[in-house]
Amino acid sequence: KGLDVLIRAMRLLGPRYRLIIAGEPYGSFEKYDELISESGDSSRFFIYPQYIRDSEVKKYFCAADLTVLPYKSATQSGISAVSNHFEKPMVVTDVGGLKETIGDRGTGIVCKKCTPECVAEAIENYFDHPERKEEFVSNIRKENERLSWNRFCKNLTEFINTLNAK
């Protein structure tokens, strides 16, 4: 998932940055604990390495300003849909369909490379330009409306009506 890249990116970011790591890891979390220890300031990391129940997801997203998905490989990510639900802009790497669902829709920043430097730069870019948050959140709201059940039902009803008219 690229968590190692994000932890290394935190080393490059100033002390004002904090990172919430939430969710059940694939395999042992030991290697990430080591990277966090090597970062020099483990107090900047808030770690919840367990399965997150649906009823608990909200508190993690409400505590966050930004969702970062530094994936090394992926086709899509369910986390991006959850992030949109909570109107959180994203920093993602250019893998799978993330560029199309995030970058092309203007709901976040796409890193050209999955490196700590690129991820750190994108995170800083987001926080150094607060006006971008408004733009991203506005685009997320439009995307949420486009993908809403209300829109789906409206389109389906219109389609059925065209069939009935024939």
Identify what each model region corresponds to:
Residues 132-146:
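A short, well-ordered alpha-helix in the C-terminal region of glycosyltransferases
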Residues 125, 129, 146-166:
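C-terminal alpha-helical cap of glycosyltransferases
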Residues 18-32, 50:
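Glycosyltransferase donor-sugar binding loop
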Residues 1-12, 81, 117:
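A conserved mid-protein helix/loop that constitutes part of the nucleotide-sugar donor-binding site
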Residues 104-105, 109-116, 125-131:
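Conserved acidic donor-binding segment of nucleotide-sugar-dependent glycosyltransferases
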Residues 89-92, 102:
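Short hydrophobic beta-strand element within catalytic cores of glycosyltransferases
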Residues 59-75, 88:
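Acidic donor-binding loop of glycosyltransferase active sites
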Residues 32-58:
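Nucleotide-activated donor-binding/catalytic signature segment of Leloir-type glycosyltransferases, i.e.
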